[in-house]
Amino acid sequence: MEKIFFNYPFNKGKLKTLLIWSILNTGQYNMINLVENLKKVGFQYATTAGISLGIDDLKTISTKYDLIEKTNDNIKDITNHLNLAVLNEVEHSQKLINSWQKISEILKININKKFKTVNKLNPIYMMAFSGARGNISQVRQLIGMRGLMADPNGQIIHLPIKSNFREGLTVTEYLISCYGARKGVVDTALRTATAGYLTRRLVDTAQHVIISQLDCGTKQGIFLSNLYQGTDILLALKDQLYGRVLGKDIKINSLMYLKNQQIDDSLSILLANHLKRVFIRSPLTCKASNSTLCQLCYGWNLSHSKLISLGEIVGVIAAQSIGEPGTQLTMRTFHTGGVFSGNVKSQLYSPFDGIVEYSSSLYGDIVNLYNGNFAFLVKRKGLIIINPIIKKIKPKKFEAILYTLVFVKNNEKVKKNQLIAQQSNKISNTQQIEGKYTVNSKLEGEILFDENHLSTNKKKIWILHGKIYKSVFPLQLFPKKNDFLSYKFPLAQAKLLNLSASFLKVCVVRKKRHFIKDNISQSNEILLFTEYPLYKFLIKNIKNYHQFQFFYPIQNKIKEVEKSLRINNKVIKDNRIKIPFNSIAKSKLLNLLNKRLEQNTFFSKNTFSNYYENTDERTTWFTQNSILKYNAIYFYKSSKSVEAKTSRKIPITFNSKNFLIKEKLFFIKNNSVLLPIFSSDFFTKFTLKNEYFKPKHNIQRKLGFLSPTSYFKYISNNYFLKYLNFYQKHISVEMNDIIKVKLYYKQEFEEKTNFKKQNLHKIDSKINLFMNKLILVIEHLILTKLFSTKINNINYLLFYFNYLKYLKESNKFTIFYCNKKKETIFDLLFLLKTLNTTSNLIILAENKISTKLLSEFIYQTIYLIKNNITINSTNSVLENFNYFQQRKEDLFQHRNIFEKVPNFSGKRFSNLSLNINNENYSISKAENKMLIQDLLTLTILNNNIKYFNSHKSFLDKRFFYNESLPIPKILKDFTSILNRINFWSFSSSQFYKKHFLFALKTDNLINIKNKNFIFISRIPQIQAVNFALKKSLKSSFDLKSYEILQYNLKFPLGFYSLIKMIIEERSLFDIDYFQKFIIQYKNFSFHLINKKLKNIFTNNSYGSFTDESTLLESKYFNKRRPTKTTFSKLMNQIKFKFFIKVPLLLSTFSKKDTVLFNIFITNKKENFRNYKIVNMLTNDFYKNLNLQTHSSEKNSQLKLSSKNLEIFNLFYTSSIINVIMKKSITNFNKNFFIDNLFQFSKTHFNWLPKWDTIVRIQFLSPYQGEIIAQNIVKYSGYKTLYNHLMILTKNEKLQVSIFRNKNQETIIKKDTKNYFITKPHCCKIYPKFGSLIYSTSQVSPGKKINQSGQIIEKSNSFLVLRKGTPLLSPITGIFYVWNGDFVSQGSPIMTLLYNKLKTGDIVQGIPKIEHFFEARKGNVDLIQTNLYIKLLAFFKKYNKTLSEYRAVKRSILKIQKIIIDGVCRVYCSQGILVSRKHFEVIVKQMTSKVKIVNGGETGLLEGEFINFQKLEKINTNLYHRRVVYEPLVLGITKVSLRTESFISSASFQETTKVLSQAALEKRIDFLNGLKENVILGKLIPGGTGLIVKIITNKI
């Protein structure tokens, strides 16, 4: 056999070709023998040659040190330029890196030359340049210099490693280079893990893809062409065609190649040579069923070079082929040289010293490079000639091709190794990215802009050194500019004031009693005041006082009063509750009705009980009959009419506005009444003998004062006053008072429209809308076993003015029977706005309910008016009923409060029946079926309910809520009422407004045992509805309800139903004061809309009225702005450790204390309560306020005289409330009580009168030096201003002599005892006082200084310099400072913008592959690379001209090509060749689903993901409304989780979620894939063997 000699190097590629040829032509056996022989030959010759590597083979380069020295000199110059602000930081960095990079490149060239000239057989040279091991850049590190390194962030460290491995590294260089080594180790570990996970995901994605048939019959396919990276071919067409199948007939040179012909090596070369793109069959377009593939679409099995076998599991093969090379890919590479290194081949260095000359044909432009330098860009070819200075050397010519950059001018001298030119491709915009570099201050000081340079391009910014003193609080500082401070000099003083005359105060937060756990947290509050009053003024003189942001009255007189009170020991007043002065916001736009704004100030601590604890048994402070009066529980009402003139252009109708105001009055009054109840709680020796509280009068009294109030309201503006007087006179009213009430009403509402009730027997479920547009009709189906069989399924229609009756009896009331006693109780249904079908009186007897528990109503409540008449007095009830009916008609039209009027005195029902005294059952509707709770709970309730006994005048109630009703969230224009039952102790209520409802999550049973406790429901979000209900209740409250209100006022969000109502009322007013207030209710925006008003008001969240509150963000008294006061906003302002008093003042409190309660939770937005000031401050402010407080036997009237208030001190807002010792109050749940615990200690010193100073706090100077500047700073997010000082200490100054020699300075001659001082001649001093000088400038003849700065002192012999650092201001950039600002060390000064070249994508290797395969939507990267966005863009583009099916098809093909090309580029750029068909198998799975946009007739849901092929089959069978869909690209993780097999998905990730979802959907797993069969232990549906059926004969 003739031997063949190959005369060229036999590298890896040639070896691979030889082996493939061998296996194809000679078979596997011979190929293995060939490989064995090659191995032997290789080892034999390697042994014979004996190449080894010793340290002697590392020959260093002698020119290296000269180069480094020159570069060091160059770098010194660059650094000086930076210090003189000639360069900015970015230019400095680029010049440094360029300098070192240049050396590195020169050394590389020299190494090459040295090896070639000295010893070509040097082992290192042989290894590196033969490609056997290593490359030139590694050799450079061995014997040249290692060069620049990157830090862990990828930033280049400016200190290069000058040594090489032959010489050894210094300690510093070793540490710098460590990062690279560590990174390599970490990368290797991470790389294998990441590649393994990538493989796992890919396998899960495609494990079910199997070859199932020979030919699927498709006519579709894809075009293949060369894959380019820029202009280079990354993957040639012939390599892609090998092993594929033609998709159509192709004719080349009269030869026809048929469709379905397999492409071997020779055919692939032929096709690639003749065609730019070839149409072939592809897995992407295969039509085989069940996500399988056919043999022809797949092509060859590349390991055998023949068509793939049937049953081959190509999905797993594809996944492993892609994942396995992943370990060879780099995770992330930081291109250290990147931006700054040119291409080695493309740079031209001068070979010797000489003069550069250009040929005349050289043509181009001057360009500004990305590193800031200028160069000449060649646009027409020419020559560069270097003429040597030494004549003996021949000149050298170089060709300058297109786009060469030339750095040297014509005829300029160049030195050896100077860079002359550099080839470059044209830099497109896409290759440039804008870089940002933030310059941070290296020291603290003051910014100064150099005005002298403003005209030039090179502007300078100076940082003049100095120490900054920042005040912790907004304080007034004692020293001024130019004062000298000594160390620890007091700069400011603040004092801590006691807010209220009190003992040591502790806030205890205790969980409600129904909950076992007690969370107790304490906070001590501190108020800081600076001692600088800013202004003193008489309030009379201030008209526009809203200009002032801070308002604080100082009441010295009160202090004295308190002290004297304390001495008397009769009454200790807690002045915390002084009425705040209120401000009215006037508006000129008020034309509606009367211009009156009523301000209500509530001070109530709702769930705040007051405790007194004595550590000492002896109560030294109180005599036995004394009482501690807690005004904290007052509801103070200060109502002041401003501009009482009315400009009525409309007749007064009794509209909701008016009645709201009326309600307010009631509310107020009751509050004052309630007061005493509180106080007696803890002093057992007190008995309340106040006649108003005698139980027998409770009910009547209510009636008594109810009507007159409303009556007076229309008579005079001073109704408040009269109302109080009236109240004092009336004690009891007998039952027949009801008729009087009626008369009052008639007088009031003279314009009546009577609405007749209609019986809508025939209407089954229609919606009737009646006037006021406030009608919501709810159809409700109640299914309950409790009902008698007659009314088992009933639709209830609720109408605004309709009475809907489904019962067969035509009575106007329903009769219920109580099983036990067979007593008949008449329920009078009082229809105000709506009659809710049947009223629901509930009588509970022995755990059974004879009547139905639920009815629903909307906007109205059902009045259960119990006459409290015993069963036999039926007649009287009937009479009353008629009366009521009339009344109902009267009241109806005025949607007003009086609905509640019906109250009767009389005896209660027997214990077993439920005693309802003015009880309102509000029944709520949910949109789902109404749950009627197990009624056992109710029965329990019944047994425990006790209302006012004849003995007690205290509350002892339970409020019951149905527990755990399933309720969806409802948010509708009109109220729909939630599914729950409330027992309120008020007669009834009515809605006149739209409310938004929020769903309740859980309700629970509320128990009110103590007079002082009010119910709190643990309801996360309470309904507006309930509030509304309460609203109307006012008129007939009885004491109980008031009490409740009182307590409730402060509930945190969840529980205020009561409160809200009250508040709401209060905050309504007739005039369009503030155009619109939107108050946010938790996360819902909650608007109450009144018919004729634009106002939107009331923040029920806090049981306070925020409606008129202006936005706190603006100046505090800015009244015209529509507010969106969300609670969160307020809290943000308050959110630092101390609470700045200013916003508090705004919050209707002159009483800091109350506010403190609210604040005590800083972290929780919900718990803060917003107050605002709404009353005008005038001297007669308190005249109308004649508050009656009943305490003990005496009537002590609290009269606040206005005189004290006339003089105010306006303080700078330095008041701060500090929550000190805050413990565990981060999460303040709605089911908390807040109890104020007053501990009386044994020592008398713990008693502090109000406004006493607790402690003085001094703020001391940390530095010694001169104050040279003062700044007032406002931090974003804070309302207050802070004082900052700039202090110049010794270290920041430099004293410089103006003389060159020391002996030139002042000489003192000693002559006996006389001293002679000889002055040297005066030198001329160049710089002026205050001027800025640089470190190189002369200060006097022959004298330079080495420090930049500003001259701040000048004398005959020396200058004093304030040190400074100049910075070059960029032409384009972002500034963060202004002239005169103080900057601390490390704070940003400016951001420099510059362009740099892209160095290839920083994301390399596996992360880049994941980017394609995961197709994440929310990727932070640019929109251009987001696959999902690209896909939608393609779809929209094609959808304009094509059908939906074709648009989806084409856009998917497009995105498939992008993904496959992208992944191929990553692998090819790393030198790894993976067949394209593997990517196609995976990508097909990623794009096989589409997203439903509209299900059409199919019932498919919007947003579902459906297989594209299946959906098209469905669509072809639809004729009318087809399915509308859009294309989808899913990442491999999502594909794995959404496979047809839930067993496969569950074994991948999120097992529980996948299995539970599959169970709920009742999915069936058809076990088509491998994985699910393996898991279940079944045969897999794949494999290339033969399936032989074994038939056994039955024996």
UniProtKB/Swiss-Prot annotation:
A family per Pfam: RNA_pol_Rpb1_4
Q: Name one GO molecular function term.
A: DNA binding
Alphabetized InterPro entries for the sequence: DNA-dir_RpoC2_beta_pp, DNA-dir_RpoC_beta_prime, RNA_pol_Rpb1_3_sf, RNA_pol_Rpb1_4, RNA_pol_Rpb1_5, Rpb1_funnel_sf
Per the annotation, how and in what number is the cofactor bound?
Binds 1 Zn(2+) ion per subunit.
**Superkingdom of the organism of origin:** Eukaryota
Key words, A-Z: Chloroplast, DNA-directed RNA polymerase, Metal-binding, Nucleotidyltransferase, Plastid, Transcription, Transferase, Zinc
GO BP terms, alphabetized = DNA-templated transcription
Q: Which GO terms describe its cellular component?
A: chloroplast; DNA-directed RNA polymerase complex; mitochondrion
Q: Give the required cofactors.
A: Zn(2+)
- Which reactions is this enzyme annotated as catalysing? RNA(n) + a ribonucleoside 5'-triphosphate = RNA(n+1) + diphosphate
UniProt subcellular location: Plastid, Chloroplast
> For Zn(2+), which residues are the binding ones?
216, 286, 294, 297
**Entry EC no(s):** 2.7.7.6
Question: Subunit structure, per the record?
Answer: In plastids the minimal PEP RNA polymerase catalytic core is composed of four subunits: alpha, beta, beta', and beta''. When a (nuclear-encoded) sigma factor is associated with the core the holoenzyme is formed, which can initiate transcription.
**PANTHER family for this protein:** DNA-DIRECTED RNA POLYMERASE, DNA-DIRECTED RNA POLYMERASE SUBUNIT BETA
The family note in this entry says: Belongs to the RNA polymerase beta' chain family. RpoC2 subfamily.
- Report the protein's function: DNA-dependent RNA polymerase catalyzes the transcription of DNA into RNA using the four ribonucleoside triphosphates as substrates.
Q: What is this protein called?
A: DNA-directed RNA polymerase subunit beta''
Q: Which organism is it from?
A: Bigelowiella natans (Pedinomonas minutissima)
Q: Tell me the gene name.
A: rpoC2
